[in-house]
């Protein structure tokens, strides 16, 4: 069987240590061979990122340039349609084959809203879910139906993520860094330092391009 790979999506406006450090820790905890970072295409009716798609992609490329764990995938940025996780995972599964163990990384807060996502039930047909713990969130879903769905798929053994191609939900004990992109944008707007929040190369790019001012 192939090595376990994971997909990690987000707006990354900008990418910061709160994105990178928990996922690097996760990779060590459960022996991930590769993490594919996929910046989202934000549809026109949603609040738009402050950086352009190209700038978000370039900041990500800088942030992971010395991290062989990560690979950048820009397919969602090339779409003119909304980014649906279910469709992205279906396409990824077709590329990787039926037997490859694949996972999608989300936060505990996102898990609780997962049943509202487009075609959510197909997500576990194509990948495992690796849930990064968030302080203050429970594992209680909004209804008994969704709670049963969660319990049916939960595993407490990360080996199960390697031995099957999809269908498991695993809650990972990853570190929580109280960093958000909105906090970084706010600090930059005020002219405050963000050296402890983002990689140096990303901060240099932000300054060179006058972003978030």
Curated annotation (Swiss-Prot):
Enzymatic reactions: nicotinate beta-D-ribonucleotide + ATP + H(+) = deamido-NAD(+) + diphosphate
Record keyword NAD present: yes
GO biological process entries: NAD biosynthetic process
Keyword field: ATP-binding, NAD, Nucleotide-binding, Nucleotidyltransferase, Pyridine nucleotide biosynthesis, Transferase
GO molecular function terms listed in the Swiss-Prot or TrEMBL record: ATP binding; nicotinate-nucleotide adenylyltransferase activity
One Pfam entry name: CTP_transf_like
Pathway given in the UniProt record: Cofactor biosynthesis; NAD(+) biosynthesis; deamido-NAD(+) from nicotinate D-ribonucleotide: step 1/1
CDD domains to which the protein is assigned, alphabetical: NMNAT
Entry-linked InterPro entries: Cyt_trans-like, NadD/NMNAT, Rossmann-like_a/b/a_fold
Signal peptide (UniProt feature, chain positions): none
EC number: 2.7.7.18
NCBIfam families reported for this sequence: cyt_tran_rel (TIGR00125), nicotinate (nicotinamide) nucleotide adenylyltransferase (TIGR00482), PRK00071.1-1 (NF000839), PRK00071.1-3 (NF000840)
Family from the record: Belongs to the NadD family.
Functional summary from the UniProt entry: Catalyzes the reversible adenylation of nicotinate mononucleotide (NaMN) to nicotinic acid adenine dinucleotide (NaAD).
Name of this chain's protein: Probable nicotinate-nucleotide adenylyltransferase
Organism from which the protein derives: Escherichia fergusonii (strain ATCC 35469 / DSM 13698 / CCUG 18766 / IAM 14443 / JCM 21226 / LMG 7866 / NBRC 102419 / NCTC 12128 / CDC 0568-73)
């Amino acid at each position: 069987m192939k090595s376990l790979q994971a997909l990690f999506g987000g707006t990354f406006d900008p990418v910061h240590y709160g994105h990178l450090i928990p996922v690097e820790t996760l990779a060590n905890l459960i022996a991930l061979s590769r993490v594919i970072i996929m910046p989202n295409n934000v549809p026109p009716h949603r609040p738009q990122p402050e950086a352009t798609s190209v700038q978000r992609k370039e900041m990500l490329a800088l942030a992971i340039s010395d991290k062989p764990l990560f690979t950048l995938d820009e397919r969602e940025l090339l779409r003119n349609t909304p980014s649906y996780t279910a469709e992205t995972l279906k396409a990824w599964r077709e590329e990787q084959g039926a037997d490859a163990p694949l996972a999608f990384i989300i936060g505990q807060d996102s898990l609780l809203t997962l049943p509202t996502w487009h075609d959510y039930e197909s997500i576990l047909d194509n990948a495992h879910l690796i849930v990064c713990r968030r302080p203050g969130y429970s594992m209680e879903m909004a209804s008994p139906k969704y709670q049963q769905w969660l319990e049916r798929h939960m595993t407490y053994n990360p080996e199960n993520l390697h031995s099957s191609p999809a269908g498991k939900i695993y809650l990972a004990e990853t570190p929580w860094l109280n960093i958000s992109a909105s906090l970084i944008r706010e600090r930059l707007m005020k002219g405050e330092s963000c050296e402890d929040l983002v990689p140096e190369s990303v901060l240099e790019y932000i300054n060179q391009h006058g972003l978030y001012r």
